[in-house]
Design a protein with these regions (language model features):
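Charged, solvent-exposed interaction patches on well-folded alpha/beta domains
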Residues: 1-208
Protein backbone atom coordinates (compact mmCIF):
# COMPACT_ATOMS: atom_id res chain seq x y z
CA UNK A 1 0.00 0.00 0.00
CA UNK A 2 1.31 3.45 -0.90
CA UNK A 3 2.13 5.63 2.09
CA UNK A 4 -0.16 8.65 1.81
CA UNK A 5 2.49 10.84 3.45
CA UNK A 6 5.18 9.88 0.95
CA UNK A 7 5.61 12.21 -2.00
CA UNK A 8 7.71 11.48 -5.05
CA UNK A 9 8.74 14.73 -6.68
CA UNK A 10 10.50 14.75 -10.04
CA UNK A 11 12.90 17.70 -10.12
CA UNK A 12 15.13 19.04 -12.85
CA UNK A 13 18.50 20.29 -11.62
CA UNK A 14 20.21 22.86 -13.76
CA UNK A 15 23.78 21.90 -12.95
CA UNK A 16 25.79 21.04 -16.06
CA UNK A 17 26.19 17.34 -15.17
CA UNK A 18 22.48 16.77 -14.78
CA UNK A 19 20.98 19.07 -17.36
CA UNK A 20 17.89 17.55 -18.90
CA UNK A 21 17.74 14.64 -16.44
CA UNK A 22 15.09 14.20 -13.80
CA UNK A 23 16.14 14.25 -10.16
CA UNK A 24 13.73 12.26 -8.03
CA UNK A 25 13.11 13.39 -4.46
CA UNK A 26 11.09 11.22 -2.08
CA UNK A 27 9.68 13.06 0.94
CA UNK A 28 8.04 11.29 3.85
CA UNK A 29 6.01 13.56 6.14
CA UNK A 30 5.84 11.55 9.36
CA UNK A 31 3.13 13.75 10.88
CA UNK A 32 0.93 13.88 7.80
CA UNK A 33 0.41 16.40 5.02
CA UNK A 34 -2.08 19.04 6.14
CA UNK A 35 -0.50 22.50 6.16
CA UNK A 36 -0.30 25.13 3.47
CA UNK A 37 3.34 25.57 4.47
CA UNK A 38 4.07 22.03 3.32
CA UNK A 39 2.56 22.70 -0.09
CA UNK A 40 4.66 25.85 -0.43
CA UNK A 41 7.73 23.87 0.61
CA UNK A 42 7.07 21.31 -2.14
CA UNK A 43 6.83 24.06 -4.73
CA UNK A 44 10.05 25.67 -3.51
CA UNK A 45 12.10 22.49 -3.38
CA UNK A 46 11.37 21.92 -7.06
CA UNK A 47 13.50 24.99 -7.78
CA UNK A 48 16.54 23.80 -5.80
CA UNK A 49 19.69 23.43 -7.89
CA UNK A 50 21.95 21.62 -5.44
CA UNK A 51 22.00 19.51 -2.29
CA UNK A 52 23.03 22.60 -0.30
CA UNK A 53 19.99 24.49 -1.52
CA UNK A 54 17.76 21.59 -0.50
CA UNK A 55 19.25 21.51 2.99
CA UNK A 56 19.11 25.31 3.41
CA UNK A 57 15.47 25.29 2.35
CA UNK A 58 14.63 22.61 4.91
CA UNK A 59 16.50 24.48 7.66
CA UNK A 60 14.48 27.62 6.88
CA UNK A 61 11.14 25.91 7.56
CA UNK A 62 10.04 26.87 11.09
CA UNK A 63 7.36 24.14 11.10
CA UNK A 64 9.90 21.32 10.76
CA UNK A 65 10.86 19.76 14.09
CA UNK A 66 13.57 17.48 12.73
CA UNK A 67 14.50 15.72 9.51
CA UNK A 68 16.90 13.28 7.92
CA UNK A 69 18.16 13.32 4.36
CA UNK A 70 19.89 10.62 2.33
CA UNK A 71 21.40 10.82 -1.12
CA UNK A 72 21.66 7.62 -3.14
CA UNK A 73 25.20 7.28 -4.52
CA UNK A 74 25.62 7.54 -8.30
CA UNK A 75 21.88 8.06 -8.81
CA UNK A 76 19.62 11.05 -9.06
CA UNK A 77 17.66 10.11 -5.95
CA UNK A 78 17.18 11.90 -2.63
CA UNK A 79 15.22 10.59 0.35
CA UNK A 80 13.97 13.09 2.94
CA UNK A 81 12.13 12.23 6.14
CA UNK A 82 10.41 15.15 7.89
CA UNK A 83 8.73 15.36 11.28
CA UNK A 84 6.45 18.37 11.72
CA UNK A 85 6.00 20.42 14.85
CA UNK A 86 2.58 19.67 16.34
CA UNK A 87 0.72 22.92 17.14
CA UNK A 88 -1.78 22.97 19.99
CA UNK A 89 -2.88 26.61 19.85
CA UNK A 90 -2.85 29.71 17.67
CA UNK A 91 -1.98 33.09 19.19
CA UNK A 92 -3.86 36.13 17.89
CA UNK A 93 -4.30 34.44 14.49
CA UNK A 94 -0.60 34.99 13.79
CA UNK A 95 1.46 32.08 15.07
CA UNK A 96 1.20 28.39 15.83
CA UNK A 97 2.69 27.21 19.13
CA UNK A 98 3.48 23.64 20.09
CA UNK A 99 3.51 22.27 23.65
CA UNK A 100 7.14 23.34 24.09
CA UNK A 101 6.15 26.89 23.02
CA UNK A 102 8.07 26.77 19.77
CA UNK A 103 6.60 29.43 17.48
CA UNK A 104 5.94 29.07 13.76
CA UNK A 105 3.82 30.95 11.25
CA UNK A 106 0.07 30.35 11.23
CA UNK A 107 -1.03 29.66 7.65
CA UNK A 108 -4.81 29.30 8.29
CA UNK A 109 -4.79 25.72 6.98
CA UNK A 110 -5.56 24.02 10.29
CA UNK A 111 -8.70 25.15 12.09
CA UNK A 112 -9.28 22.57 14.84
CA UNK A 113 -6.83 24.18 17.28
CA UNK A 114 -7.30 26.25 20.42
CA UNK A 115 -7.55 29.92 19.46
CA UNK A 116 -5.80 32.16 22.00
CA UNK A 117 -6.33 35.91 21.99
CA UNK A 118 -5.11 38.82 24.06
CA UNK A 119 -2.02 40.75 25.20
CA UNK A 120 -0.25 37.73 26.71
CA UNK A 121 3.34 38.08 27.92
CA UNK A 122 3.84 34.68 29.55
CA UNK A 123 2.66 31.88 27.26
CA UNK A 124 3.42 29.31 29.94
CA UNK A 125 0.16 30.44 31.50
CA UNK A 126 -1.67 29.26 28.38
CA UNK A 127 -0.10 25.80 28.62
CA UNK A 128 -0.98 25.69 32.31
CA UNK A 129 -4.64 26.47 31.55
CA UNK A 130 -4.81 23.87 28.80
CA UNK A 131 -3.34 21.20 31.07
CA UNK A 132 -5.69 22.03 33.95
CA UNK A 133 -8.94 22.38 32.00
CA UNK A 134 -8.42 19.40 29.71
CA UNK A 135 -7.28 17.12 32.54
CA UNK A 136 -10.96 16.47 33.21
CA UNK A 137 -12.66 13.43 31.71
CA UNK A 138 -15.68 15.51 30.70
CA UNK A 139 -15.66 15.92 26.94
CA UNK A 140 -17.78 19.07 27.31
CA UNK A 141 -14.69 20.90 28.53
CA UNK A 142 -12.62 20.51 25.38
CA UNK A 143 -11.22 24.00 24.87
CA UNK A 144 -12.16 26.08 21.84
CA UNK A 145 -10.87 29.51 22.87
CA UNK A 146 -8.73 31.11 25.55
CA UNK A 147 -9.07 34.87 25.92
CA UNK A 148 -7.10 37.22 28.14
CA UNK A 149 -8.03 40.84 28.81
CA UNK A 150 -6.89 43.40 31.35
CA UNK A 151 -10.51 43.75 32.50
CA UNK A 152 -11.65 40.12 32.91
CA UNK A 153 -8.39 38.21 33.06
CA UNK A 154 -8.44 34.63 31.75
CA UNK A 155 -11.58 33.21 30.14
CA UNK A 156 -11.64 29.68 28.75
CA UNK A 157 -14.45 28.72 26.37
CA UNK A 158 -15.60 25.24 25.47
CA UNK A 159 -18.61 24.34 23.32
CA UNK A 160 -21.13 24.95 26.08
CA UNK A 161 -19.28 26.43 29.05
CA UNK A 162 -17.34 29.59 29.89
CA UNK A 163 -14.74 29.08 32.64
CA UNK A 164 -13.54 32.29 34.29
CA UNK A 165 -10.22 32.25 36.15
CA UNK A 166 -9.61 35.98 36.59
CA UNK A 167 -6.34 37.86 36.27
CA UNK A 168 -4.14 35.63 38.44
CA UNK A 169 -3.86 31.87 38.04
CA UNK A 170 -3.38 30.28 41.45
CA UNK A 171 -3.20 26.78 42.84
CA UNK A 172 -6.32 27.45 44.91
CA UNK A 173 -8.33 28.37 41.81
CA UNK A 174 -7.18 25.23 40.03
CA UNK A 175 -8.08 23.09 43.03
CA UNK A 176 -11.52 24.72 43.19
CA UNK A 177 -11.97 24.04 39.49
CA UNK A 178 -11.09 20.35 39.87
CA UNK A 179 -13.39 19.92 42.86
CA UNK A 180 -16.21 21.60 40.95
CA UNK A 181 -15.71 19.41 37.88
CA UNK A 182 -15.79 16.29 40.05
CA UNK A 183 -19.07 17.48 41.56
CA UNK A 184 -20.53 18.21 38.12
CA UNK A 185 -19.52 14.75 36.97
CA UNK A 186 -21.45 13.23 39.89
CA UNK A 187 -24.64 15.19 39.23
CA UNK A 188 -24.32 14.98 35.41
CA UNK A 189 -25.20 18.62 34.98
CA UNK A 190 -23.04 21.07 33.01
CA UNK A 191 -23.38 24.83 33.68
CA UNK A 192 -23.00 27.58 31.10
CA UNK A 193 -20.53 29.45 33.35
CA UNK A 194 -18.02 28.23 35.93
CA UNK A 195 -16.54 31.21 37.78
CA UNK A 196 -13.59 30.43 40.06
CA UNK A 197 -12.55 34.05 40.64
CA UNK A 198 -14.11 34.22 44.09
CA UNK A 199 -12.10 33.67 47.27
CA UNK A 200 -14.93 31.87 49.04
CA UNK A 201 -15.82 29.35 46.35
CA UNK A 202 -17.10 28.82 42.83
CA UNK A 203 -20.13 30.39 41.18
CA UNK A 204 -22.14 28.29 38.71
CA UNK A 205 -24.61 29.65 36.20
CA UNK A 206 -27.00 27.32 34.40
CA UNK A 207 -28.61 30.01 32.26
CA UNK A 208 -28.44 30.02 28.49
Amino acid sequence: MLNKNLLLIPLIFFASLSLGKNYEISINFESGFEYQSQKQFIESIKLSKSSKEIEHLIDDQDWIKNYSIRYKPFKKEVFINIKNREPIFVLNEMYFYDRDLNKFNFDHSKKDLIMVEGPIDDLRQVIKLINVVESTTLSQFKINNINYSYVNGWDVKSNNTLIRFGKKLTKKKFNNYHETVNYLFEISKIPSIIDVRYKDGVALNYGK
